[in-house]
Amino acid sequence: ALAAARLEQLLEEFNITRLREAPAMALSGGERRRCEIARALAAHPSIMLLDEPFAGIDPISIADIRALVVQLRDRDIGVLITDHNVRETLDIVDRACIIYDGRVLFEGTPEALVADETVRRVYLGEGFAL
């Protein structure tokens, strides 16, 4: 009974009730991401890993996923994001890491990352702006 109630709560919260019976292959990228996050939350995690959450989804879904990440953070759920989409990620994180050539090149605040000359030279590009 508790699991069924939790399922209903998550389906409503993530606006995916209509997808309950849909096969995974029929879902859009954004719908798939919302289902993945809701499924992970069913286990009441203290931390979540989101691997490339902004890859292959439309701008509206990107905004939705960004809002979900902020909601997770507001629930005191740690969120670790691995993604190449720096613009979509930097303004919703407290800390960022750049891994380059198999090693941590930089770790710090998003502001410090964008200002770092080495990061700009080897990863972001000199003309990068948020």
Predicted regions and their residues:
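Helical segment within the ABC ATPase nucleotide-binding domain
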Residues: 63-75
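Conserved catalytic motifs of ABC-family nucleotide-binding domains
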Residues: 44
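Conserved ABC ATPase "signature" region
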Residues: 1-19, 70
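Hydrophobic anchor residue at the start of the ABC signature
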Residues: 37
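Catalytic Walker B motif of ABC-type/P-loop ATPase nucleotide-binding domains
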Residues: 48-52
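Conserved ABC ATPase signature
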Residues: 23-27, 31
